[in-house]
Amino acid sequence: MAEVTYKGKSFEVDEDGFLLRFDDWCPEWVEYVKESEGISDISPDHQKIIDFLQDYYKKNGIAPMVRILSKNTGFKLKEVYELFPSGPGKGACKMAGLPKPTGCV
């Protein structure tokens, strides 16, 4: 277990930098991941994906498959990669505070 501190707030993360506790997610976490992923600004499109991922996780306890993410947000995979350069799993799920996906997200 590792710890990341950003703007005075500490987060426990796994070996890949994902939050250990979903309930620790907060705006400071988003800012931290945004900077570490090299994303300049969080747009409404970013927020739409984050909100969907969080809602899906709260209901199902897992991250959605990519096709479910695409179908429900209206974004093609290419567009998700444009928003989150490291992809839907590493970038989007991490920013949304989800644990590291085990499947194909």
Curated annotation (Swiss-Prot):
Annotated GO biological process: tRNA wobble position uridine thiolation
Record's keyword terms, sorted: Cytoplasm, Oxidoreductase
GO molecular function: dissimilatory sulfite reductase (NADH) activity; sulfur carrier activity
Any Pfam family: DsrC
Enzyme Commission (EC) number: 1.8.1.22
Subcellular localization: Cytoplasm
Gene Ontology CC terms: cytoplasm
Primary location: cytoplasm
Catalysed reactions listed for this entry: [DsrC protein]-trisulfide + NAD(+) + 3 H2O = [DsrC protein]-dithiol + sulfite + NADH + 3 H(+)
Record's keyword annotation contains Cytoplasm: yes
Top-level enzyme category: oxidoreductase
Family annotation (Gene3D superfamilies): 3.30.1420.10, DsrC-like protein, C-terminal domain (1.10.10.370)
UniProt keyword annotation of Oxidoreductase present: yes
SUPFAM superfamilies cross-referenced by the UniProt entry: DsrC, the gamma subunit of dissimilatory sulfite reductase (SSF69721)
Coiled coil ranges: none
Function field: Catalyzes the reduction of sulfite to sulfide. This is the terminal oxidation reaction in sulfate respiration, a process catalyzed by the sulfate-reducing bacteria.
Assembly with partners or alone: Heterohexamer of two alpha, two beta and two gamma subunits.
Family: Belongs to the DsrC/TusE family.
Protein name from the UniProt record: Sulfite reductase, dissimilatory-type subunit gamma
Organism of this sequence: Nitratidesulfovibrio vulgaris (strain ATCC 29579 / DSM 644 / CCUG 34227 / NCIMB 8303 / VKM B-1760 / Hildenborough) (Desulfovibrio vulgaris)
Gene: dsvC
